[in-house]
């Protein structure tokens, strides 16, 4: 499901963001995409979570039943990841390459550090909880970076 969303973002959303000149139109496009993507993402996430036992049985074997506990944080992280990417794509569309690279490197390092700490504290579920927290923080940073655009008064 992530591949469907990211492919759509690359094919439609990124070129669309690049061609928009007006901040008002850009803001409207961003909110329009959120209104389209978030419901799909919620349905997909809830569907996968609800069918996690079936998915594990079909794709793996009984030895992997323990991974069912990892789904919640993984899917929550995926939700925050896509929500943050909808804003991060603005950096690419607006030639903010340096900021994009710095933020990607910074949050890759933060994920590694969070994962090491959380795995030590919580075991294997620490990896997926670190992933969810990392992308929650990334979404917060993207909202901070684009706060003037997102929260501008009409």
Residues of each region from the PLM?
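Transmembrane helix-bundle signature of multi-pass secondary active exporters and lipid flippases
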Residues: 1-11, 40-44, 74-81
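Helix-loop junctions and terminal segments of transmembrane helices
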Residues: 3-23, 90-93
């Amino acid at each position: 499901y992530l591949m469907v969303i990211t492919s759509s973002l690359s094919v439609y959303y990124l070129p669309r963001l690049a061609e928009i000149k007006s901040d008002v139109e850009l803001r409207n496009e961003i909110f329009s995409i959120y209104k389209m993507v978030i419901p799909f993402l919620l349905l997909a996430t809830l569907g996968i979570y609800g069918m996690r036992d079936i998915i594990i049985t079909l794709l793996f074997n009984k030895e992997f039943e323990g991974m069912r506990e990892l789904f919640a944080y993984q899917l929550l992280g995926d939700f925050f990841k896509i929500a943050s990417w909808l804003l991060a794509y603005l950096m690419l569309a607006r030639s903010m390459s340096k900021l994009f690279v710095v933020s990607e490197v910074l949050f890759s390092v933060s994920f590694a550090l969070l994962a090491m700490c959380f795995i030590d504290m919580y075991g294997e579920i620490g990896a997926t909880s670190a992933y969810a927290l990392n992308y929650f923080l990334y979404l917060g940073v993207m909202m901070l970076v684009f706060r003037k655009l997102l929260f501008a008064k009409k």
